[in-house]
Amino acid sequence: MPFYEHVFIARQDLSQAQVDALAETVTGVIGEYKGQVHKTETWGLKQLAYKIQKNRKGHYVMLSAEVSGEAIAEIERQAAINEDIIRWMTIKVDELEKGPSVMMRKQERRGGRGGRDRDGEE
C-alpha cells in the first residue's frame, strides 16, 4: 500500500480532547480500510497566516499512514463534511519520515514555546 501524510487544521475553539477525537476518527477510517497509522503528531495551537472561516488560530495535527486510495478519499470526504476541520491536505510520499517531523524538531529546539531564553539568547 502507498504511504500518505495527512495534515488537518481544527478550529481554534476546540479543546485538546476534541482535537484528539478528530485524530482518532481519521485513525478509525484508516483501520476500517486495513491501513496502518505509523505516526500521529499534534503540533498544537498555531497562528494562521490569514483568517480562515473567522479563525485566526488553529490546532494542527499530522498523521503518517500506509493506506489505500479509497481510504484517503473517505478521509477527505469526512473532512469536507466536518465543520470542526477548517483545512486539510493529503500528500502521497515515497517513504515515511523516521523520527519527529520538521515541525516537532523546531518545537523541541525552541523549548516548546518558541520564545527566547531569559538570557536573551535563542
UniProtKB/Swiss-Prot annotation:
Residues 99-122 are annotated as: Disordered. Residues 105-122 have a biased composition (Basic and acidic residues). GO terms for biological process: translation. Keywords: Ribonucleoprotein, Ribosomal protein, RNA-binding, rRNA-binding. One of its GO terms (molecular function) is small ribosomal subunit rRNA binding. One of its GO terms (cellular component) is cytosolic small ribosomal subunit. It holds the Pfam family Ribosomal_S6. NCBIfam families: S6. Binds together with bS18 to 16S ribosomal RNA. Belongs to the bacterial ribosomal protein bS6 family. This is Small ribosomal subunit protein bS6. It comes from Sphingopyxis alaskensis (strain DSM 13593 / LMG 18877 / RB2256).
